[in-house]
Amino acid sequence: MRFVLSFIFLIASSLSFAAHKIPEFTGPDFTGVYQCNGLDMHEGEYKGKVTLKLKKEHSQAQYGSYDFLLEVPGYGKYPGHMAANGLIAAMHFALENQSTHDFGTGISQFSKNAKGQWQFHKFYFEPKFKGGNSGFEDCVKQ
């Protein structure tokens, strides 16, 4: 009798697990290269390039997971990652040269411009760069 009950429990557990299928990604895909104009509260105005790549295997429903890379001439590369919920996304980034503590987190709002291109406006905070720092970026997909 115990064997039968254990077997029934095992089958029921397996069916329950199968019912929890991860939903397919249905959110917007922001993959691409973006040209950016930024304003850093310590460094001033700058131009950069952001590359986003969807990680579909880690995305589901309206939630998107991305590789993130910001490149700023004269400063370097800031690899990181981005998590999106619909048109709102959070990013973490860190300068490859970690000696300056130039890393932070940003929050962005995505939209399409009049030409139908994805664009985003980002606010970022860097807790350790030069005693703390913040700034803005406006980026348009090329």
Placement of each model-derived feature along the sequence:
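Central antiparallel beta-sheet cores of small beta-barrel/beta-sandwich binding domains
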Residues: 19-142
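N-terminal signal peptide c-region/cleavage motif recognized by signal peptidases
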Residues: 13-16
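Positively charged n-region of N-terminal signal peptides that target proteins for export
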Residues: 1-4
